[in-house]
Amino acid sequence: MSEQRTEQRLALQGGLKAVSGVEGHGKPKIGVDELMAVVERFGLSSDAMAGIRDIAEADTWGGGPFLANYYSGLDESKVQAFERCGREIFGSTYALGTNSGTAALHCAFTAVGVGPGKEVICPAIGFFATAAAVVQAKGIPVFCDVDQSLCMDPAKIEALITPRTVALAPTHLRGVVCDMDGIMAVARKHGLRVVEDVAQACGGRCGDEYAGTIGDVGCFSISAYKIVGGGEGGLLLTDDERLWERANQVAECGGLWRPDRFAAPRYE
């Protein structure tokens, strides 16, 4: 056995690294032209199409800015740039990029404590993903009637609250922002978390506050059919560090990537 292989120090302490580099490229499952034929169906501009083709033809997928968040050695990946953009635009402390608005909702509901037997009050009208994400988090959606705006009616919420209720999930529908003042008043009175579904109202405001920054967590979709379209993707915003870390654990399949991975937890 070589002297290197008998090294007792951890890589962190200067010992042998388990992986020092990646050689070669895997064969893609589909060709660039086939991918572009699919992308073309979304009706994107020629500039957007050219940008997507440049990414698809790049040789830096594994170690470049597009897929690598942790091992590329870059100061900022494309996902991290997207998260930074979300923080800057909406003034939130934390942001988490996901593969869809539904995934953002799943992360959010798990973060606020939804689980087996726990209930989340959702609007009776809206996209199915809101309630589906509650079920995905092992919770039970309870449907609340809507008012003339077609958004959740704050006056109808209290009758639905039980000892199992942990959160409200107002959905800002078709660009219309919910009555967040009324919804937040009920949530504060009963000690409930609020997860805003902003998939259809990105940029909408309630007074001086952006939709998605009023409750505990805001969840956005950037699919090709949304107000801000990016092909497919989602974004979670919050000002609560603990909620962000819990949501990030879901996104990372149970991992917890702190800025310093070896730091002690910052909460009890």
Q: What are these regions, as identified by a protein language model?
A:
Residues 1-100, 107-110, 188:
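Conserved PLP-binding active-site segment in aminotransferase class I/II-type PLP enzymes
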Residues 4-24, 31, 201-207, 214-268:
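Active-site region of PLP-dependent enzymes
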Residues 86, 104, 120-121, 134, ...:
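Hydrophobic alpha-helical segments that mediate membrane insertion or helix-helix packing
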Residues 92, 139-140, 192:
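Short glycine/serine/threonine/alanine-rich loop segments
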Residues 95, 104, 108, 139, ...:
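Small-residue (primarily alanine) positions within well-ordered alpha-helices
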Residues 96, 121, 142, 194-195, ...:
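Structural detector of well-ordered beta-strand residues that form the stable sheet scaffold
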Residues 106-161, 167-169:
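Conserved PLP-anchoring active-site segment centered on the Schiff-base-forming lysine
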Residues 148-245:
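Active-site phosphate-binding strand-loop segment of PLP-dependent enzymes
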